[in-house]
Amino acid sequence: FIPSLKKADCPSLYAGSNASKPYSSADCIVYRLGETYLISAEIDWRLGNNQSAAERLTTLRNRACKGHDHSMDITAAEVTQEFLLDGYAREMIGEWNRWMTLKRFRAFESRITKANPQITKFDKNIHYLRPIPTAELLLIDNANEYQNPGY
């Protein structure tokens, strides 16, 4: 069994009457309220305001589980980098901004090797940056001065 994810797939909005078309007229999700709560909690955590971060995360959790008791409320002591990264992983699964979140937290190595221990070629001195596209570098005379290390 291999799970799949079709978070933004909307077959009823495929163009034309033929639902086998490879494209859709569904809206593209660019920013979500859940992400706003996570970013706000992250900022509070980085500023040392764990109580405020916990309140934001509890609000986010309440959105997902209406009518729950307070046993799911988050305390200030629970707000850590790992807790926030887990929250981002749950809330933003399958969305494009995961790379930026892991980069911002400098958590590639811990998160990638935790999820996939077979990854051995991760180099923190190289892989936090992406290569500058060759097409861009060909437009300047001193391209070798601008390419990121390791590429």
What do these predicted ranges mean?
Residues 65-66:
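Helix-capping and short linker residues that terminate individual alpha-solenoid repeat units
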Residues 1-60:
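C-terminal substrate/ligand-recognition segments
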Residues 2-3, 10, 20-30, 61, ...:
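Long, intrinsically disordered, low-complexity segments
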